[in-house]
């Protein structure tokens, strides 16, 4: 019994060789891949990750739903990148690639537009007017709940300043527009974000990039004047004030010279005039001229988003419209004068006949034959040349 116990104890003791030689395994040990901890800040549009030691290469890019790739420039020692010209409301995928002297790292980050589909603001648009004011409008999403509320945020291209809407336009208590009377914080290109909130469900956001040159609506030209001489008319106007800093070469104008009292359906030809230092247009118009009106509108020569028409300026005279009427009046007056003259002559002729009636002809009572000539031409009975009249005597004897 003692021998059995002793043998069992000896079997449980570790083998001396096991204590001196480390255990070897046939399976290769693989270290778990460390995460780059990629993160994205939508306010600054900055994508960042944890820096790795001995980095030899790194890049970042995004892919949208249309498989378009945007890759900003990045140096090897940077651990972040910033995206400037992107919209996120359709959902994007960020991806970071980093290589070190020992291994490579890759990580993706999905950035979806969380919330119920169709709850985001729709039909978003903005326009600048009067050089200092801007209106933005949008519509409620078709699947948005009744208690939805939208909020507008604007960031300039440098992402250094965020503008919140100061004055909202409401429809049944829901924000559907925004009015801004101070545009000092805007740059040439700006990022617009419309967020939504609701107690019932999540609301998707909408974002857009807008260029101030494309959304500005010019005021019509001012100080429009027209001066005419006997043969020409000269139109002058003043360049409209704009939010952008533009020279006269950046403008294109259209003139609508319209003649008054024309037949309905008559189309007027629009006259295109390039911007000029003096802003003038000279066209032939001889006197007498009918009454006309002229109005002008302006646009950026690169975009041609036309302004409204200026107030119509009239020139010419209503008497000018009688140019063609004069002909008809002269014809009528001439006809009347001729009629009066003819009537006067006719009456005078009647008076003359009354004063000097015609002498009646002597009637031939012996011969009622009307075929006999009333007038005898004695020349027909001229004697023969060299002969005189001969008298013949006829003697009549009475026989018993």
From Swiss-Prot:
Motif (Box 1 motif): 355-363
The keyword Metal-binding belongs to this UniProt entry's keyword annotation: no
Positions annotated with a glycan in the UniProt record: 46, 54, 99, 123, 135, 182, 195, 223, 229, 272, 305
Membrane topology, Cytoplasmic segments: 347-400
Disulfide topology: 126-136, 165-178
Main location: membrane
Keywords on record: Cell membrane, Disease variant, Disulfide bond, Glycoprotein, Membrane, Receptor, Secreted, Signal, Transmembrane, Transmembrane helix
Residues covered by the Fibronectin type-III domain: 220-320
Cell location: Cell membrane
Positions of transmembrane segments: 321-346
Miscellaneous comment text of the record: The gene coding for this protein is located in the pseudoautosomal region 1 (PAR1) of X and Y chromosomes.
Function as written in the Swiss-Prot or TrEMBL entry: Low affinity receptor for granulocyte-macrophage colony-stimulating factor. Transduces a signal that results in the proliferation, differentiation, and functional activation of hematopoietic cells.
Family to which this protein belongs: Belongs to the type I cytokine receptor family. Type 5 subfamily.
Complex formation: Heterodimer of an alpha and a beta subunit. The beta subunit is common to the IL3, IL5 and GM-CSF receptors. The signaling GM-CSF receptor complex is a dodecamer of two head-to-head hexamers of two alpha, two beta, and two ligand subunits.
Disease note: Pulmonary surfactant metabolism dysfunction 4: A rare lung disorder due to impaired surfactant homeostasis. It is characterized by alveolar filling with floccular material that stains positive using the periodic acid-Schiff method and is derived from surfactant phospholipids and protein components. Excessive lipoproteins accumulation in the alveoli results in severe respiratory distress.
Protein name stated in the entry: Granulocyte-macrophage colony-stimulating factor receptor subunit alpha
Organism name: Homo sapiens
């Amino acid at each position: 019994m003692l021998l059995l116990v002793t043998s069992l104890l000896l079997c449980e003791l570790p083998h001396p060789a096991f204590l001196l030689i480390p255990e070897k395994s046939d399976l290769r040990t693989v270290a778990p891949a460390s995460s780059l901890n990629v993160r994205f800040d939508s306010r600054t549009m900055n994508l960042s990750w944890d820096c790795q030691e001995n980095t030899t290469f790194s890049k970042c890019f995004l892919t949208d739903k249309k498989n378009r790739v945007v890759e900003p420039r990045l140096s090897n020692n940077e651990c972040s990148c910033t995206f400037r010209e992107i919209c996120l409301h359709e959902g994007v995928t960020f991806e970071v690639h980093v290589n070190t002297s020992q291994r490579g790292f890759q990580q993706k980050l999905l950035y979806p537009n969380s919330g119920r589909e169709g709850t985001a603001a729709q039909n978003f648009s903005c326009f600048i007017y009067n050089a200092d004011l801007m209106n933005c409008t949008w519509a409620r999403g078709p699947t948005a709940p009744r208690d939805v509320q939208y909020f507008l945020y604007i960031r300039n291209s440098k992402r250094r300043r965020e503008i919140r809407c100061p004055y909202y336009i409401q429809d049944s208590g829901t924000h559907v527009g925004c009015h801004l009377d101070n545009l000092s914080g805007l740059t040439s290109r700006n990022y617009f974000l419309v967020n939504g909130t609701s107690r019932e469900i999540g609301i998707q956001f909408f974002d857009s990039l807008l260029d101030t040159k494309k959304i500005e609506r010019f005021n019509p030209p001012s100080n429009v004047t027209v001066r005419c001489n006997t043969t020409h008319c000269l139109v002058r106007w003043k360049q409209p004030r704009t939010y952008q800093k533009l020279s006269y070469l950046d403008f294109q104008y259209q003139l609508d010279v319209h003649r008054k009292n024309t037949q309905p359906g008559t189309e007027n030809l629009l006259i295109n005039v390039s911007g000029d230092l003096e802003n003038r247009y000279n066209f032939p118009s001889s006197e007498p001229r009918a009454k006309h009106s002229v109005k002008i509108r302006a646009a950026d020569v690169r975009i041609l988003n036309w302004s409204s028409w200026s107030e119509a300026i009239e020139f010419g005279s209503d008497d000018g419209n009688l140019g063609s009427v004069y002909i008809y009046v002269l014809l009528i007056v001439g006809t009347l004068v001729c009629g009066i003259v003819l009537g006067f002559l006719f009456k005078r002729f009647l008076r003359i006949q009354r004063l000097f009636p015609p002498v009646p002809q002597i009637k031939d009572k012996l011969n009622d034959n009307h075929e006999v000539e009333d007038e005898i031409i004695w020349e027909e009975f001229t004697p023969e040349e060299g002969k005189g009249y001969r008298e013949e005597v006829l003697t009549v004897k009475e026989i018993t």
